[in-house]
């Protein structure tokens, strides 16, 4: 999704994740699998709708990589043996096994954002939503992050909805492009 600053991209994306949807009166409906998204059971919404914020530090809640990767699954009540399996699989997919025992503070901004993505993907979401995830990254880290999004889509068939200013890198990868203008998707 593309659009000028202030066009409503972030507001729309946040409507798709009930736990972070803005307060206030909404016009129209946001449907997920044919039902209003706000009617989704909280656990289901947490597992099936992943969200990565713009800032690498906006969603990290623990002090160690291993804890961060497991946090969402633990909160969802996933059994410990499944948590270990899913965390190991996703760390391998992302190539971040070497970070596993590191403190979060030892990671760069690009590594933190990649960890955010891995922490969301370990939940195995049906839909991955990202709000300008590379805007605070250096060009190399941004390229690595975009490459991982392409890999997630190509190898795992992951549905991805994102806003991003690096349009020239992402437009060739998109199946559809929506334009936001004055709060409306065109």
What is each model feature region?
Residues 36-50:
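ABC ATPase NBD coupling module
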Residues 103-107:
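Conserved ABC ATPase signature
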Residues 128-131:
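Catalytic Walker B motif of ABC-type/P-loop ATPase nucleotide-binding domains
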């Amino acid at each position: 999704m593309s659009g000028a600053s202030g066009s409503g991209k972030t507001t729309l994306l946040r409507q798709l994740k009930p736990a972070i949807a803005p307060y206030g009166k909404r016009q129209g409906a946001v449907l997920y699998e044919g039902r209003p998204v706000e009617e989704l059971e909280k656990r289901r919404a947490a597992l099936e709708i992943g969200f990565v914020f713009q800032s690498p530090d906006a969603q990290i809640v623990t002090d160690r990589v291993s804890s961060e990767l497991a946090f969402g699954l633990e909160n969802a009540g996933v059994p410990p043996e499944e948590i270990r399996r899913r965390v190991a699989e996703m760390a391998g997919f992302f190539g971040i096994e070497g970070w596993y025992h590191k403190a979060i503070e030892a990671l760069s901004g690009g590594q933190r954002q990649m960890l955010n993505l891995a922490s969301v993907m370990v939940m195995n979401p049906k839909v991955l939503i990202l709000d300008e995830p590379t805007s605070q990254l250096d060009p190399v880290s941004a390229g690595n992050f975009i490459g991982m999004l392409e890999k997630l889509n190509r190898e795992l068939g992951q549905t991805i909805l994102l806003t991003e200013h690096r349009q020239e890198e992402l437009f060739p990868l998109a199946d559809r492009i929506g334009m936001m203008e004055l709060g409306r998707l065109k």
